[in-house]
Amino acid sequence: MTSFAIYVLAALAEIAGCFGFWAWLRLGKSPAWAVLGVLSLVIFALLLTRIEAGAAGRAFAAYGGVYIIASLAWMQVVEGARPDRWDLIGGVICLAGAALILFGPRTN
């Protein structure tokens, strides 16, 4: 599986996990949502360990850009709130930064 695919799956797992707690604590849903949230967050953490990177911090930093784009997509698809142009511009800037971190030339 490619790094990008792992990042996308990790983002969906993290967002779903956090949303489980949001649904429980903010939307008054059943505590079962929190249990699902915990399971999803465990999957998220396991997925990030599959990234090929020389340092954990680099893998996590690059993931941040993908997380932001996935969060904006979640906002529109799941919550029905359309991202505005500033959301989209910010997301593109963050994704460009993530690409530099992940794919930039390295000197040893």
Curated annotation (Swiss-Prot):
By its UniProt entry, which SUPFAM superfamilies does this protein fall under?
Multidrug resistance efflux transporter EmrE
InterPro entries registered for this protein in UniProt: UPF0060
- Name a GO CC annotation attached to this entry: plasma membrane
Nucleotide-binding among keywords:
no
List where in the cell it is found.
Answer: Cell inner membrane
Q: Which domain of life is it from?
A: Bacteria
Principal location: membrane
Q: Which residues span the membrane?
A: 4-24, 27-47, 59-79, 85-105
Q: Which UniProt keywords apply?
A: Cell inner membrane, Cell membrane, Membrane, Transmembrane, Transmembrane helix
How this chain sits in the membrane, per its record, is: Multi-pass membrane protein
* PANTHER family registered for this protein in UniProt: UPF0060 MEMBRANE PROTEIN YNFA (PTHR36116:SF1)
The entry's family comment says: Belongs to the UPF0060 family.
Please state what the protein is called: UPF0060 membrane protein CCNA_02055
- According to its UniProt entry, this protein's organism is Caulobacter vibrioides (strain NA1000 / CB15N)
Which lineage is the organism of this entry classified under, starting from the top rank?
A: Bacteria, Pseudomonadati, Pseudomonadota, Alphaproteobacteria, Caulobacterales
